Structure formats: structure tokens, C-alpha cells
From Swiss-Prot:
This is Acyl-CoA-binding protein. An acyl-CoA binds at residues 30-34, 56, 75. The keyword Transcription regulation does not apply. One of its GO terms (molecular function) is fatty-acyl-CoA binding. Pfam families: ACBP. Transmembrane segments: none annotated. Residues 3-88 form the ACB domain. Keywords: Lipid-binding, Transport. It comes from the Eukaryota. Belongs to the ACBP family. One of its GO terms (biological process) is fatty acid metabolic process. It comes from Gossypium hirsutum (Upland cotton). Binds medium- and long-chain acyl-CoA esters with very high affinity and may function as an intracellular carrier of acyl-CoA esters.
């Protein structure tokens, strides 16, 4: 299985976690997912009244230096860690 296929598998698998990840973990996953699928941030930062979108944008911006492949690998690792923490794999 190639990296892209494994990434896509884990992007689906994360939806089956027994408990919802923390907000911090969700933001990490969001940033890595966007970096892996879109690449570097290509939008302007949302305004101060849209906090949710601003946090998501910041999470994406935080991983901007990673290649798509690095982001995919980190995403897979994070999903595996979340399943281990939840006690199921």
C-alpha cells in the first residue's frame, strides 16, 4: 500500500475513534490533512470574529513547511497514536 492510500485509509479510520479527540488533536489533524491534500496555506487568515476558522487556519499555517508526503506521514502517525490512547487499534 502506498503512502497516499494509507493516508486516505487513516483519514476514514479517524472517524471511527471510540471517543472524540481533544480540540488540540483535532486542530493538529486538520492542519496536517490540509497540508497533505492542498499544500501550503492559500487563503488569508480569517478575521477575529471567526475564531473557529482562525484556529483551523493557524493549525494549517503551523505545518506549512512540511511536504505533502511529510504531512501524510505525520497524519498517519497521529491517528495511530489516538487509537492507541483510546485502547483500540
Amino acid at each position: 500500500m502506498g503512502l497516499k492510500e494509507e493516508f486516505e485509509e487513516h483519514a476514514e479510520k479517524v472517524k471511527t475513534l471510540p471517543a472524540a479527540p481533544s480540540n488540540d488533536d483535532m486542530l493538529i489533524l486538520y492542519g496536517l490533512y490540509k497540508q497533505a491534500t492542498v499544500g501550503p496555506v492559500n487563503t488569508s487568515r480569517p478575521g477575529m470574529f471567526n475564531m473557529r476558522e482562525k484556529y483551523k487556519w493557524d493549525a494549517w499555517k503551523a505545518v506549512e513547511g512540511k511536504s505533502k508526503e511529510e504531512a501524510m506521514g505525520d497524519y498517519i502517525t497521529k491517528v495511530k497514536q489516538l487509537f492507541e490512547a483510546a485502547g483500540s487499534s
